[in-house]
């Protein structure tokens, strides 16, 4: 929030005594404090990615509008992607988990999955910009090994790698519709992204 916007809200509250204005001001200041703390502690990338998920306009499920704690890890999902982290990131948390994510995190044999090349943040941003300039409705990032073509929403992939640019990306060999997994060597951040169906 800017100093000008804060001043205007205080003036409006003084004039109307509308508690909704004061509540909005408090929420805005709390958000600013969280962002400052994240930046100071070097956690802004994970926080930014989680906020991209909980703030997804396509996310129509209210219970996924905020993150929650799962086994001590901050977790967020929107039906397309999920991020869970053990890092102490300052984001808004709800009290109860809206869904049991344990089945998504256990028993899939991550180490046995096939590794995909991890694109750079710069390459993803360039792809999004080029597709937008060409008037495309959305942007798809495609891995093609000659036998399997796997496509994902480029913006969602960018969000996942914003949380951890050096994550290893793995997939079920030969399955273009199975979930794609992201992991870092220290297991601080773990993610899942669903692919987009495209013509073979």
Regions from the PLM with identified roles:
Residues 2-200:
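DNA polymerase processivity clamps
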């Amino acid at each position: 929030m800017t100093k000008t916007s804060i001043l205007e809200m205080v003036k409006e509250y003084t004039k109307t005594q509308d508690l909704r204005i004061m509540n909005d001001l408090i929420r805005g200041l709390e958000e600013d404090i969280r962002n400052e703390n994240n930046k100071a502690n070097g956690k802004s990338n994970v926080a930014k990615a989680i906020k991209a998920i909980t703030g997804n306009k396509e996310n129509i499920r209210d219970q996924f509008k905020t993150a929650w704690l799962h086994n001590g890890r901050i977790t967020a999902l929107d039906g397309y992607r999920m991020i869970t982290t053990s890092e102490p990131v300052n984001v808004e948390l709800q009290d109860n988990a809206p869904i049991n994510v344990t089945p998504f995190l256990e028993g899939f044999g991550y180490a046995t999955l096939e590794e995909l090349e991890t694109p750079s943040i710069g390459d993803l941003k360039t792809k999004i910009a080029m597709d937008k300039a060409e008037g495309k409705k959305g942007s798809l990032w495609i891995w093609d090994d000659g036998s399997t073509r796997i496509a994902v929403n480029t913006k969602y992939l960018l969000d996942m790698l914003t949380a951890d640019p050096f994550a290893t990306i793995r997939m079920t060999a030969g399955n273009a519709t199975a979930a794609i997994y992201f992991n870092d060597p220290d297991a601080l951040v773990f993610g899942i992204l669903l692919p987009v169906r495209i013509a073979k």
